[in-house]
Structure formats: C-alpha cells, structure tokens
C-alpha cells in the first residue's frame, strides 16, 4: 500500500510505504570546528543534531543516524558515511541540493539508497585519517584546520614510530580512558608522514611547510589517532629526551610509561572509508 504526497517547496512526488523501509546512505564532509563532535549530545551543537534537523524536513520518520566513525569536537571529515532508514522514498539528488544550499558547515557529497544490510559502521572494511600540522606560525585563517606544534620535530623519528604501529596490536594505551569496547585490538595497514609547502593566500611571496600524517586501519578506538600522534610528538620533539624505543615500550606494555596529551583536534580529518 502506498500513499502519495506532493511537497510544494520542491514539487517532489513522495511515496510513503506502509510496509517497506528504505536504507539511505550519505557521504558527507563537515567543518568540525563548528561542532561539539559528531555524536548527539543534549544541549550541544553536533554534526548529528544539525544533519538530522535538515533531513527530518524531508524524512519525518527518522529515528537514528548511524555514523561510520565518531569524531571529537573540532575534528573534521572529508568522507564520513552515515545511514538511516525511512518509509519515505524521495529524489535523493533534490534533497542533497536543498541541504547543501541551506547547510553552511555540512555538505553532502553523495546520497543514495542502498541494500538493507548496509551499515555505515559495521560494513566498513578500512578507514583513513590524515593529520595536518606545522611547526611554523600559521595564518589565522588556518588555525582551526591545521595544528600548530610549538617545537621542531625530527620527521625521521616520527616515521620510525609510525612504522611500529603498522600491523595488528593492542592499542589499549591509546584509547580514551573510560571507553567501553569489546576489544582494543586493531590492525593498521599504512602509516606515513609527508611534507609539502603551502602558499600563503594573503602573501604570494610567503610559504610555510606543512606536515601530513596518514594512517589507515580496519577500525580505530575513540581518540586513538590523536593519542598516537600526541605520544609520537613528545618523542620526536627537539626538547625531549625520549626515544623511539620508549614508544615501542608504550605500545608493548600497554600502559603509560610517560605522560602525553592527545594531539589537538584541529588538524585531524576523517578522510576516507572503504566498503
């Protein structure tokens, strides 16, 4: 049985099934500096609350949005995936255009209906995060999007430590304290640091050196990437006496043998997800 509706604002025919549910999938990007993380929190602005506000205008029966990965306050996404179910069947391209027009900090890249079994988090087989930082003074317009590190670092040491996380390990020491997961074992497929020059937009004669850390894995614990990079920064910093061997001990002993802080959220991006 079907019910037909016509929406005046878009002149879109909407078919509402009283039996079937459609599994909608979105690929989105967002500016994390505007949000208190991706996951819904009462009385706080989050990616989930903002996105749901736009979607519910069209899909009146939305209950839950399922995100492929959870991001902290200030963390950005280039290719985050979200799915939800609804009995409403709409033209996803028109909905995408409408939301992109009215949403400043969240943009929909792709929007489509997939098979019912698809689950944004559980169906993912690989994820990629990138982390951008510089030890040079940044233009103010980049301060929310690239992390500033106040001490020079040895990039050879950074890569040596990154090589240690490749493979299957227990990353217990790098998860946020108090996290509740079935297992803290994760597999990292790729971890690398690169550097490149960025031409300052407001001064054509000036450029700054940026560093990009890329990490790919099957899944990540909450705050795992920021903690790994924070610990490596402590070791690679020019004013520290720690060595890559200390990072190895940290990983193997699964306890904090030295204090470190998570790297600032501003430089972290959920970049890609594979299914």
What residue spans do the PLM features occupy?
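Structured-RNA-binding interfaces characteristic of tRNA pseudouridine synthases
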Residues: 2-8, 12-275
